[in-house]
Regions:
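Active-site entrance/lid segments in N-terminal catalytic domains of soluble metabolic enzymes
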Residues: 1-149
């Protein structure tokens, strides 16, 4: 066991000060934001909320509904070329879909097959339990090399 004796901060050490607002009403709030991504230099505009890639949430029907609000849906890892083909005619949802994957060789092959047939995906969600592992870092690097944009 390691004993750490340095001072740690907790919630009582943090002070949130509300920022003055020029808005008169909540309806004046604009949720759409534009982001420029560091590694690809691509820009994306939309509402920065992502629906999880969980069963029942990361599904094509959910994506159709959330795309109307410019919200991204991370498709579940179970989706393949056959299931994605079912929605490929709905071009309005393309900018609001993210392809989810694990980090196994089979997962990488699956996303390569999907992206070969459907190049409209702008986002890849790499979903694993431990994002601190070396394996995860290497997988992210290989995905960035294969799909730089």
């Amino acid at each position: 066991m390691r004993i750490e004796e340095d001072i740690k901060l907790d919630y009582s050490d943090v002070l949130f000060r509300p920022k003055r607002s020029t808005l008169h009403s909540r309806k004046d709030v604009k949720l759409v934001r534009t982001y420029k991504f560091k590694y690809s230099n691509n820009e994306w505009s939309g509402i920065p909320i992502m629906a999880a890639n969980m069963d029942g949430v990361g599904e094509l029907e959910v994506a159709k509904n959330l795309a109307e609000f410019e919200i991204i849906t991370n498709l579940t890892k179970q989706h393949n070329t056959k299931t994605i083909k079912r929605c490929s005619y709905i071009k309005s949802i393309y900018p609001h879909l993210a392809l989810s994957t694990g980090t196994s060789d089979e997962d990488f092959k699956r996303i390569k097959d999907i992206l070969k047939e459907f190049s409209f995906f702008q986002f890849i969600c790499i979903d694993i339990a431990n994002g601190y592992s070396d394996h995860f870092s290497k997988f992210v690097k290989s995905v960035r090399e294969k799909y730089p944009t």
